[in-house]
Amino acid sequence: MILVDVNLLLYAYHPRAEQHEKSRAWLEEVLSGPDLVRFAWLTLWAFLRIATNPRVFDRPLSTSEAEAAISSWLAQPAAGILEPGERHWDLLRGLVHDGQTAGALLMDAVLAAIALEHGAQLCTTDRDFSRFSGLRWTNPLVEAR
């Protein structure tokens, strides 16, 4: 089971993003493949917030376009939502302490805790996730790590 980070979603939906083609191809492949693909609500909210922001993109998506993208992902048979469970708070506290995480990196710790709690591998291009001990993560846009 994989858990998808927002950076891959943003790259896949913005043609001017440097990693657009690779991200789009990867996302289409995993959503049509046999593996379980999971999203966290915070990732989907971040996609809505960032993808529609004209301060971030010269040509942001409309809210309707961003909502349609999310709906299309969730409609795939392999897709679903991972939510924090009963162990989330304890896992998050440990990650925040051990990874010396604060500020902007706190949401990374939340996503890492969700992945750890459910045994998911996090797919991201963000190397900051290497700070979280025990987290299985990969950058699917590179051949080998």
Residue ranges with predicted function:
Residues 5, 108, 126:
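Acidic active-site catalytic centers that drive phospho-/nucleotidyl reactions
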Residues 1, 112-145:
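Acidic, PIN/NYN-like endoribonuclease modules and their adjacent C-terminal/linker elements
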Residues 1-3, 7-39, 54-68, 144-145:
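Short, well-structured N-terminal submotif of metal-dependent ribonuclease cores
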Residues 38-41, 124:
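Short beta-strand segments at enzyme active-site cores
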Residues 73:
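Ligand-binding beta-strand-loop-alpha-helix segment within the catalytic cores
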